[in-house]
A protein has these predicted regions:
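An aromatic- and histidine-rich active-site surface loop
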Residues: 1-12, 25
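A short, active-site helix/loop in glycosyltransferases that binds the activated sugar's phosphate group
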Residues: 43-80
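A conserved, positively charged/aromatic
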Residues: 16-44
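A conserved mid-protein helix/loop that constitutes part of the nucleotide-sugar donor-binding site
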Residues: 103, 107-126, 143-147, 242
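A charged, aromatic-enriched C-terminal amphipathic alpha-helix characteristic of glycosyltransferases
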Residues: 239, 253-286
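Aromatic "clamp/platform" in nucleotide-sugar-dependent glycosyltransferases that forms part
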Residues: 166, 185
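Conserved acidic donor-binding segment of nucleotide-sugar-dependent glycosyltransferases
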Residues: 217-240, 250-255
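Short hydrophobic beta-strand element within catalytic cores of glycosyltransferases
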Residues: 202-206, 211, 215-217, 225
Length: 288
């Protein structure tokens, strides 16, 4: 729709703000890149939802109408929904487990190859704790899910993974967990990381494009088999199972270093009211 409206702007005079949600680095076709560059230049503003995305837009397309505005998050609603114990009770009965007693990390999102769930499975040979489980929330590509479940079975890890499918309210599950793991090869902006921080939960995330570094406020180079950590979570290289195991082991052994109150304060700039002000300010500037 963005490009359609940009095309119409060639013929009609109206104000246009486009919101771009995916990484520009995923546009590999040279012809498509030229089309995107030309049409987006017609917009009054192109909102990018992460700094990496904005930098890529400026670098690749040389347009000067890029603006950084994060996705809005209703933090109060997320906190409210996280108190729904019915979600926990339903999972406990349906999957014969007790989320109130087990120690687990949560993975939330579409289960597709881009999410690299196999990295978690491969990391288990180097995880030192016998008590850790992984709760996977979401649906997706049936073939990929079957392949992951086959990999889990081949490594005798069936007791370590629970696939609960899609949940309309994953926040109660996140709240009970030790933290959230994201393994993606790439993201536009991983909203689940903001939602986890909102609930005071630390993050283990792949250093993918784009979002995790920005959300975690982590800088510095990251080599193979290495991790970078701060009070909000841990970053590891994409697809690096050994580094992911190091991250999980560190978080297990040093969980108290990730302070919930500091984690929660990090997400205020993603609050829906803050983002609303940014949109209103941009609209006012364009309509003067």
């Amino acid at each position: 729709p963005n490009l359609v409206y940009c095309f119409l702007k060639i013929f009609f005079d109206f104000k246009l703000i486009c919101v771009h949600h995916s990484s520009f680095r995923r546009i590999n076709n040279a012809f498509i890149k030229k089309i995107v560059k030309y049409l987006y230049s017609k917009a009054d503003a192109v909102i990018c939802i992460s700094s990496d995305m904005l930098n890529d837009y400026i670098t690749q397309h040389k347009n000067k109408n890029g603006v950084l505005v994060y996705n809005p998050h209703d933090l109060a609603r997320i906190k409210y929904l996280s108190n729904d114990i019915n979600v926990i009770d339903k999972i406990n009965s349906q999957f014969d487990c007790n989320l109130n007693e087990i120690s687990y990390y949560t993975v939330v999102g579409r289960i597709i190859p881009l999410k690299r769930i196999e990295t978690i499975v491969e990391s288990f040979q180097n995880i030192t704790s016998d008590n850790i489980k992984i709760l996977i929330v979401g649906d997706g590509d049936p073939k990929y899910i079957t392949a992951i479940q086959g990999l889990i079975k081949s490594r005798n890890l069936k007791d370590k993974f629970v696939f609960v499918g899609h949940l309309s309210n994953p926040y109660a599950v996140i709240k009970k967990s030790k933290g959230v793991i994201l393994c993606s090869e790439s993201e536009g902006f991983p909203n689940i990381l903001v939602e986890a921080l909102c609930l005071g939960k630390p993050i283990i995330a792949s250093d993918c494009i784009s979002g995790p570094r920005e959300i975690l406020c982590i800088n510095g180079k990251l080599g193979r088999n290495e991790i970078i950590k701060n009070e909000f979570g841990i970053l590891y290289p994409v697809g690096d199972a050994l580094a992911l195991a190091k991250a999980i082991n560190y978080m297990n052994e040093n969980h108290t270093t990730f302070i919930g109150s500091k984690i929660k304060s990090r997400v205020e700039e993603f609050n829906i009211m803050h983002i609303k002000k940014k949109y209103l300010s941009l609209i006012n500037c364009l309509t003067k």
